[in-house]
Amino acid sequence: MLKSTILVAVADIKGGVGKTTTAMLIAGCLARRGEHVTVLDADNTGGATLWDEYVRIEDDRRRKEDEANGTPHKPYKLGFDVIQTNDVILGMPDRIRERYKGWVIIDTPPSDAGTVQTALQAADVSIIPC
């Protein structure tokens, strides 16, 4: 487990290159290793936030199915929090470090150079899918 907070920006100005998928898969892998992970969804389309909601809906569906079948419910969850954010928050990396511990994965939007630049400046590590 980390003793500090590491900010990781998954960024590219181009859309459709897999930023959200990359961010969520990295977060999932780290969470499965027992790391504390938070995804900050700075993408105005809310892809990571929607992903989180889809998992919640699927968990509810499975719970109802398990109840109907009389079987124990095994929770279906991401294993980390997804928080909607914006460039103002990203511009305060010290506040992010105070609030969130472990790994903070930042999912950035396409076609918003300002938010992408702010995320890259805040990050300790940048991943640019292509």
Identify the role of each PLM range.
Residues 2, 7-17, 24, 29-105, ...:
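P-loop/Walker-type NTP enzyme "switch/lid" segment
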Residues 21-22, 26, 118, 122:
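Residues within well-formed alpha-helices
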Residues 113-130:
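Inter-motif core of Ras-like GTPase G domains
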